[in-house]
Amino acid sequence: MDKPLISGIFLWISSFFRFKHQILSMPTAGYSGTPLIRKLGIKPGWKLRLIGAPADYFRWLSEDVSAQVCPPRAIPDFVHLFAVTRRDFEREMSLLVGICGKNPQLVIWVSWYKKSSGKATDLTEDVIRGYALANGLVDIKVCAVSEEWSGLKLVVPVAKR
């Protein structure tokens, strides 16, 4: 192969990976293009609790809300639980249902791996919804959190707040 051809191929490959890096570095908003922070409804001043969140969670939000993360013993206004297994989900939710008694306005987002992620999980939207309904919560919204994660929003029904 001649040098100009090799140089051209190298230039194309390096441009491709630079472009791929730029795309992957952008905040993920799912299919709608709506910023994740808006999809989740995170409000300024809310106390946030994250459980099992991926390392790049704050980058997905497109706004820095890391200062709103509350200490473990504080009663949060917003919880985002990332669960890989049904067992982990049920263990964490048993604690969160108790917090709903102290803060009936609590917003709980539960995220699980999408089928398209290729990750093994026994947790599904139906499992989450069934647990919520059996424990006095209702689901009011679903969204794509990232390319790998879906999310279901759970709250105490208005009549019980």
Give each language-model segment a name.
Residues 23-60:
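N-terminal, charge-rich interaction modules
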Residues 66-76:
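Short acidic low-complexity segments
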Residues 81-94:
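Active-site-adjacent loop/helix micro-motif of nuclease/hydrolase catalytic cores
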Residues 92-123:
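Mid-chain, well-packed structural core segment of small domains
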Residues 123-139:
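Conserved Class I S-adenosyl-L-methionine
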Residues 136-161:
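Class I S-adenosyl-L-methionine
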